[in-house]
Design a protein with these regions (language model features):
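Conserved active-site-adjacent core of cysteine acyl-enzyme catalytic domains
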Residues: 93, 277-427
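Tryptophan-centered motif/residue detector
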Residues: 10-11, 109, 132-135, 229, ...
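Beta-strand-rich ligand- or partner-binding modules
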Residues: 24-227, 376
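Histidine-centered active-site/metal-ligand motif
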Residues: 117, 251, 362
Length: 428
């Protein structure tokens, strides 16, 4: 998958490059991950109600009807058209204040969207000069594309910030607080409702990463290899051009498909798509093609939208977040807990021994560590065959390909109730 790296985006916006800030005492860069309680007392609702801890549309008090134009109607002759009149309800969080100024934020959500429904997630940052910026749309999402084309939203940039695919970046001023808003939509006249069960966000400031890596391992002599099923993205080259043509463009859905299948095999619960669901795919490993279509961002024209991949995994019955880790030391507890991680990386000039020569943006699965922690065991979908997918990468080289490229972005996918290490709440 080709997507702009953090360094490219920050430079293009005229912001400080990673590592260009004055040297600081060695400490991890600040980040904050938060899961929002949908029943929080400081949140507000309009046209929505809580049922079993999840958010649905209420029976009355809905907003609308409002018109929506699906700019991707009948995309590639698929016959789908989300245009029409919609009723809606909203949930708005209270203010989340942070102990640091952040310059990027990624939200993620878990939702069910029956036919004719979809959800929109927005963020409103408060900048360090005290003023509140506008609401930025982070995604318009439905699990199916049969009657709505899920999409990121371009052209939102202003003096305060911009959204690149799925990530809010601030400009001249960092943000010190933010609010999230989720809007649930259904076609006017329908009784169907989306169900939002989880909403989270990770905010960070990556202008100085000194102290984050290289990291010291916590491994104590016994290696861990979770044995995630290996899928190659390359065997799908040329498949379904309307979903970005397979091959190098499908690293994210291939990685997501690997982890979903891992949980299917580990828990003996069928999270993966069934043969009936992927009957339209005439190729080997059809679950990869199915996933690529199910995460495809019709505005971005790609399958690498981070929250869309997490939302897809959640739509299969799992719990999923997009978050950030400072280094592999923080990844090790997840591996020991049996939880593989999908990581966003980039490198050039053969800087990762055993990997492809270079990539502007790539996703792969962290599935283990050697006993001394010097090697990270990875399922790298950028391999010619499934059998060649497992790789052993140097720890320090991997961190250098991961942290500067994405700030340690991972998809954290696991079953409901699975024992999960604590995520970084605040490290400033």
């Amino acid at each position: 998958m080709i997507r702009h790296t953090l360094l490219t985006l920050v430079a293009a916006a005229g912001l400080a490059l990673v590592g260009s800030a004055p040297a600081l005492a060695a400490q991890p860069y600040p980040l904050n991950f938060k899961t929002f309680a949908l029943n929080a007392s400081d949140s507000t609702r309009s046209g929505t109600t809580l049922s079993g801890g999840s958010l649905t549309l209420a029976s009355s008090g809905l907003g609308g009807p409002s018109a929506y134009v699906d700019t991707f109607a009948n995309y590639s002759g698929d016959g789908a058209d989300g245009s029409g009149s919609y009723d809606s309800g909203t949930w708005t969080s209270g203010v989340t204040g942070l102990g640091f100024g952040f310059n990027e934020l990624v939200a993620s959500w878990n939702a069910k969207t029956p036919s004719g429904t979809w959800v929109q997630v927005e963020v409103q940052p408060q900048l360090d000069d005290g003023h509140w910026a506008k609401w930025y749309i982070l995604g318009q999402w439905s699990s199916s594309d049969s009657d709505f084309h899920r999409t990121s939203v371009g052209g939102q940039g202003d003096a305060d910030g911009f959204v690149s695919i799925d990530t809010l970046f601030t400009k001249d001023h960092p943000a010190v607080a933010y609010r999230l808003r989720a809007t649930l939509y259904r076609r006017s006249g329908s009784t169907a409702t989306p169900t939002l069960s989880r909403l989270s966000a990770v905010a960070s400031n990556l202008t100085n990463q000194k102290g984050s890596f290289p990291s010291q391992t916590t491994m104590t002599g016994t290696g861990v290899d979770l044995g995630v099923p290996p899928y190659s993205q390359e065997i799908h080259h040329g498949e379904f051009p309307q979903y970005d043509n397979g091959g190098e463009a499908w690293c994210s859905p291939t990685s997501t498909a690997m982890v979903v299948e891992y949980w299917t095999r580990t828990t003996h619960t069928n999270y993966s798509p069934t043969p009936a669901e992927y009957a339209w795919v005439p190729y080997p490993d059809p679950q990869v093609d199915f996933t690529a279509r199910a995460v495809y961002d019709y505005h971005y024209n790609g399958a690498g939208n981070w929250p869309f991949n997490a939302a897809y995994a959640a739509s299969r019955g799992l719990v999923a977040d997009v978050t950030q880790l400072h280094n592999l030391r923080e990844a090790e507890p997840f591996i020991r807990a049996g939880i593989p991680l999908v990581a966003s990386v980039a490198w050039n000039s053969n800087k990762l021994d055993g990997g492809i020569k270079s990539t502007n943006g790539h996703l792969l699965v962290i599935e283990g560590f050697s006993g001394d922690g010097s090697k990270v065991i990875v399922n790298d979908p950028a391999s010619d065959t499934n059998g060649q997918v497992p790789h052993l990468y140097d720890r320090t080289q991997f961190e250098r390909a991961w942290i500067p490229a994405s700030g340690g972005i991972v998809y954290l996918i696991r079953p409901t109730g699975w024992p999960t290490p604590s995520l970084t709440a605040n490290n400033s």
